[in-house]
Amino acid sequence: PDAKRFGRGTKFISVMDILNNQFICYDNIRASVEVMDGDIDTYGVNYGDILFQRSSETLEDVGQANVYLDSKPAIFGGFVIRGKSKGNYNPLFFRYLLASPTARKRIIVKGAGAQHFNIGQDGLSKVSLDIPCMQEQKKIGELLQCIDARIATQNKIIEDLKKLKCAIIE
């Protein structure tokens, strides 16, 4: 999109949104863009869509993935690949699955490049992963989300204790 269209309008999912969020929700998408006719049809994302980082300066980061967990309209940019559901899956579980060491290894080998590494839809479509039944996906996703929430709480407590310690020392 033209640079003048940025800063207002429809939320625009960039690579930074994929990398810097546990999950992508409408309210944590940083950028906005004025959309043209047909942009929503072509680049729109729906709840549960998987978004991949198309290119990276390091092979280890190519194909990093996240999921959109909102129903509000948003679009994705050119350095992002959108994956649509071919079947039934739990988006929460899938986010964790795609970040697992096994999935990362299988995605990384599909990347190509010398100084800048890329992966395309064709490469991603050839990645094979073992996926449990929907009931198990739901349980695993919820458990991992609970663990992440607990880790975040503990990290906040640690930060607060560090601040308290500094205040006492000063």
Predicted regions and their residues:
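Short, ligand-facing micro-motifs at secondary-structure edges
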Residues: 19-31, 50-76, 92-96, 105-109
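A cross-family detector of function-defining hotspots
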Residues: 170
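Cleft-lining beta-strand/loop regions that shape enzyme active-site pockets
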Residues: 13
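A short glycine-rich beta-alpha junction/loop motif
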Residues: 7, 73-79, 89, 101, ...
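Sequence-specific dsDNA recognition surfaces
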Residues: 1-2, 16-50
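Amphipathic alpha-helical segments
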Residues: 94, 128-167
